[in-house]
Design a protein with these regions (language model features):
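A conserved active-site cap/scaffold subdomain adjacent to cofactor or substrate pockets
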Residues: 135-165, 170, 175-176
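Histidine/acidic-residue-rich, glycine-tolerant segments that coordinate divalent metal ions
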Residues: 5-9, 13-139, 148
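Short HxH-centered metal-ligating active-site micro-motif
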Residues: 1-2
Length: 176
């Protein structure tokens, strides 16, 4: 959707320039991993925008508007916990739940939100709950966090705090 919408804007801009006899060069770059791995960062690093006077992008949203500015710096990081499986009814005391660690981490991060800058955002998704059997203490679980703030040093600070919360969750559940 993003690539198609941006390509349509390139075609419209080309037509506008031709109609108004405007000189210039238009370059269209697809930017893979728009949010997850930051495809644009590699293009910037490799000099694709060095002689560029203007860079435009398009992103779907509600309504129509033009905006300017910058987006937030972000880290996306997986946290994987490993525990000890056990039968949850017969011998739960032998288990160490990786899923409990993920849930405690999520609670800790949610409480941290009150104590971070207003412009920061932290989102998460449980990507592996350990299985679909509720009668088993889950030995592996994983959560993906997206940590965002206006500046990279702010993201790094939040990332370190999130890592400490993960360590605390592992300590509480005797998982790794």
């Amino acid at each position: 959707l993003i690539g198609t919408g941006t390509l349509a804007s390139v075609i419209a801009l080309k037509d506008f320039m031709k109609e108004h006899n405007l000189k210039g060069t238009i370059r269209y770059y697809g930017c893979p991993a728009e949010e997850n791995a930051g495809g644009k960062a590699f293009l910037v690093r490799d000099g694709y925008f060095n002689d560029c006077d203007l860079a435009l992008c398009w992103h779907p949203e509600q309504g129509r508007r033009a905006c300017y500015g910058s987006t937030k710096a972000n880290f996306r990081v997986f946290f994987t916990f490993h525990g000890t499986p056990a039968h949850a009814s017969m011998c739960p005391e032998l288990g160490r739940s990786a899923l409990d660690a993920v849930e405690l981490m999520d609670v800790g991060v949610n409480y941290m939100r009150e104590h971070m800058i207003d412009e920061a955002r932290i989102h998460y998704a449980i990507t592996d709950a350990g299985g679909d059997a509720p009668n088993v203490v889950q030995s592996r679980a994983q959560v993906l966090y997206a940590i965002r703030a206006p500046k990279i040093p702010q993201v790094k600070e939040l990332y370190n705090r999130v890592c400490n919360i993960a360590k605390g969750a592992a300590l509480m559940t005797e998982t790794t």
